[in-house]
């Protein structure tokens, strides 16, 4: 009797063992999907990991069905799953859920997309027979028109002789009805007469149009060519290379040349981007060159589309290039040769909730090593960890310090809004300098971007009389006003509340919004510039793939000229006519209780500033702050990444933070705050007995209650070189001991490794 270990798509650690019935031996191999029972009535699609003869001590159920003829998961993918589960301390079931499209985990069989086609019956496929068919319908005018339309579309009308030729074109039923302006009943009448018949064809959901045109790749500038050569030299010595290039230096063109080289060597390429918005712009550039060799993969695609991409990657003709967001790292590759991680510093590469809380950059580097492939990290503002690795010689380093075609870096003008408010010179959140710059840009047919890293209308509402602030009943946060839907919304659990008309505390009707979100910015700027064509880019306006594409296309083509947005607008988007960028509130990024606050603030401001001044003209950035003397403000103005790096590095060394130490956040959750407090103290005491002063806490996080669950956080700081396996064994053991305590039956403990 053979047995198979499987992963179930449930938040359960480890594998489960099933017996393999005699009739399935040979079909059950690692990587195939199996239908297995669990409990009395549940059935799941499990992933086979290991086939063996080791009879378990318990009675195990048999596999019910093998769903694949060939594996849906390649060996390297399985190893990546196992690494993610181990390193990020996540159940393998959670990794399975994150990795595979829903259609491959569902017990309902995936249905390929079908199209109904119309064809001429074999009886009427000669010139003489066609005349007979036309005579049959000559008095039924709609049928006659539909038949002649079909003959024209399919090219049957241009045939002579009795033998059909290669020139016959397939015609869909929908196309025929649209062209002949007929109903389905008319087509049915022709079918009933035996003149036409219909058949189904699998057409797929993927765009397969477009040949590759590698000859369209633009030649590199001298600076780009030097960087390209430098990357190839470094890749001869290092597995990972960091390309540190200023904004608008033409990094994407270098990537395209590297992709071409990989394709010519018959290798596949994985190109990761942090935001779906970015894939829209870069997709157009890559598609012009690589055509249907390019596949796109991200969460805004339908589940069926993602299944088809997955299956194509397993076929004999996979995509040469995959462009995608974080989840694309899980796709199958048969011959991966190059991984490109653009904007490698971006925090959106890190999955937060649910588990696995993996970092796509780290996972992609590990995946590349499994294939013997090379990894290129590209950014204008490297993460501290990547730059440190490059400085230490772990990664190769190539720098590109000039903008493409000599475009100057933007002029950054710092505006002290505290002084302007005192002199009553501010118009809401807008300084006179910013309004003047936007006015000038619009007058000259240019575009402007306003950056405010807070969506909604107002971050909170408050009673002007007693100071009452409405809070979420499920979470420990104030509610955000969304004026367009006239609701208060919790950005943590999604719960919505009606806007109160009077204060429940004092009865006052003076309830006002406080602060500025992107929605309020949009309202106020529209009053100041009524002639402007304004668009807003935030989570609320980009929930669908089409919404992203429409926003970016409208701004690229000049149908809108003023873009207001959150951090989405900072991420590598390339707009030719943007001459002004306004950073409305730099302080909101700096005054954050996190050791990475300055690093993230610098990156955000440097990146959004880089959107200004693209072709032929130096851009202008208006940076509004109450603290113009903050060192990081000067570093942004002078584009002084090195100064930021050196300043922060010493602090990190002193206070035991990355890149010198690894962090693991241990979270404890429970419905009752008292139980959560007690359990977290008990857990931290156990951890302190092993790790000593490396353990901090427990403390309440910034938001200590989410979705009715109370939270405590324990931080463990681990020096580089510590035995990672021992650390994980200790943590798992402590968690198991807590699980055995009857007081903590409903307690949740989970981990965030290398938190951002």
Question: What is each PLM-predicted segment?
Answer:
Residues 1-379, 391-407, 690, 724-756:
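Accessory, non-ATPase domains that flank or precede helicase/AAA+ motor cores in DNA-metabolism machines
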Residues 215-221, 225, 237-677, 685, ...:
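Inter-lobe coupling/hinge segments of SF2-like helicase ATPases
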Residues 14-16, 172, 662-664, 710-712:
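Short amphipathic alpha-helical segments
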Residues 50-52, 100, 200-202, 452-454, ...:
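A general secondary-structure junction signal
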Residues 685-710, 749:
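A carboxyl-terminal module marker
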Residues 118, 412, 479, 511, ...:
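Generic structural motif
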Residues 12, 455, 708:
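A short catalytic or substrate-binding loop motif that flags glycine-/basic-rich loops and adjacent residues
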């Amino acid at each position: 009797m053979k047995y198979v270990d499987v992963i179930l798509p449930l938040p359960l650690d480890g594998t489960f063992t099933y017996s393999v019935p005699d009739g399935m031996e040979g079909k059950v191999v690692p990587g195939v999907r199996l239908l297995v029972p669990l409990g009395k009535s549940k059935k799941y699609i499990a992933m086979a990991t290991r086939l063996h003869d080791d009879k378990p001590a318990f009675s195990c159920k048999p596999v019910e069905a093998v769903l694949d003829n060939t594996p849906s998961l390649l060996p390297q993918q399985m190893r990546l799953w196992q690494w993610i589960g181990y390193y990020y301390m996540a159940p393998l079931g959670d990794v399975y859920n994150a990795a595979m499209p829903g259609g491959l985990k569902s017990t309902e069989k995936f249905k390929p997309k079908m199209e109904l086609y119309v064809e001429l019956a074999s009886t009427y496929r000669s010139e003489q027979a066609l005349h007979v068919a036309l005579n049959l319908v000559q008095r039924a005018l709609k049928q006659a028109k539909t038949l002649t339309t079909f003959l024209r579309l399919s090219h049957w009308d241009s045939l002579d002789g009795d033998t059909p030729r290669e020139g016959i074109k397939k015609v869909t039923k929908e196309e025929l009805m649209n062209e002949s302006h007929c109903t389905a009943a008319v087509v049915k009448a022709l079918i009933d007469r035996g003149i036409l018949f219909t058949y189904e064809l699998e057409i797929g959901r993927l765009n397969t149009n477009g040949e590759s045109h590698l000859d369209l790749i633009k030649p590199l500038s001298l600076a780009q060519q030097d960087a390209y050569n430098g990357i190839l030299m470094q890749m001869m010595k290092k597995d990972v290379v960091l390309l540190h290039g200023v904004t608008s230096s033409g990094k994407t063109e270098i990537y395209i040349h590297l992709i071409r080289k990989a394709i010519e060597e018959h290798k596949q390429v994985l190109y990761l981007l942090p935001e779906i918005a970015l894939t829209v712009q870069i997709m157009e550039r890559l598609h012009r060159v690589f055509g249907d060799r390019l596949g796109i993969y991200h969460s805004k695609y339908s589940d069926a589309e993602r299944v088809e991409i997955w299956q194509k990657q397993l076929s004999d003709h996979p995509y040469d290039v995959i462009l995608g967001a974080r989840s694309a790292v899980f796709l199958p590759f048969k011959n991966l040769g190059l991984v490109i991680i653009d904007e490698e510093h971006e925090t959106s590469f890190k999955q937060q909730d649910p588990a696995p809380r993996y970092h796509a950059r780290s996972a992609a580097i590990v995946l590349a090593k499994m294939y013997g492939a090379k990894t290129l990290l590209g950014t204008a503002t490297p993460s501290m960890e990547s730059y440190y690795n490059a400085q230490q010689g772990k990664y190769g380093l190539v720098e590109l310090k000039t903008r493409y075609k000599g475009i100057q870096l933007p002029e950054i003008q710092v505006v002290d809004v505290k002084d302007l408010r005192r002199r009553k010179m501010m118009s809401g959140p807008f300084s006179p300098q910013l309004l003047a710059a936007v006015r000038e840009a619009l007058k000259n047919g240019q575009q402007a971007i306003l950056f405010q890293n807070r969506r909604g209308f107002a971050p909170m509402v408050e009673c002007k009389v007693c100071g009452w602030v409405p809070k979420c009943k499920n979470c420990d946060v104030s509610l955000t006003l969304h004026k367009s839907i006239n609701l208060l919304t919790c950005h943590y659990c999604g719960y919505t509340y009606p806007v109160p008309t009077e204060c429940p505390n004092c009865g006052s009707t003076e309830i006002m919004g406080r602060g500025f979100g992107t929605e309020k910015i949009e309202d106020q700027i529209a009053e100041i510039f009524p002639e402007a064509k304004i668009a807003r880019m935030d989570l609320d306006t980009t929930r669908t793939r089409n919404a992203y594409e429409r926003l970016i296309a409208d701004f690229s083509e000049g149908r809108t000229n003023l873009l207001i947005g959150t951090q989405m607008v900072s991420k590598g988007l390339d707009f030719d006519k943007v001459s002004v960028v306004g950073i409305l509130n730099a302080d909101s990024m700096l005054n954050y209780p996190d050791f990475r606050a300055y690093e993230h603030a610098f990156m955000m401001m440097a990146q959004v500033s880089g959107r200004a001044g693209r072709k032929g003209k130096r851009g202008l950035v208006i940076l509004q702050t109450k603290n113009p003397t903050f060192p990081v403000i000067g570093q942004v103005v002078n584009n002084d990444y090195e100064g930021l790096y050196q300043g922060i590095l010493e602090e990190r060394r002193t206070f035991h933070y990355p890149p010198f130490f690894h962090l693991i956040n241990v979270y404890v959750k429970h419905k009752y705050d008292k139980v959560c407090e007690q359990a977290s103290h008990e857990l931290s005491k156990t951890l302190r007995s092993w790790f000593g002063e490396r353990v901090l806490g427990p403390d309440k996080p910034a938001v200590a209650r989410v979705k009715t669950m109370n939270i405590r956080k324990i931080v463990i700081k681990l020096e580089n070189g510590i035995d990672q396996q021992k650390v994980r064994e200790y943590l798992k053991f402590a968690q198991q001991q807590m699980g055995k305590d009857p007081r903590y039956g409903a307690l949740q403990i989970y981990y965030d490794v290398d938190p951002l």
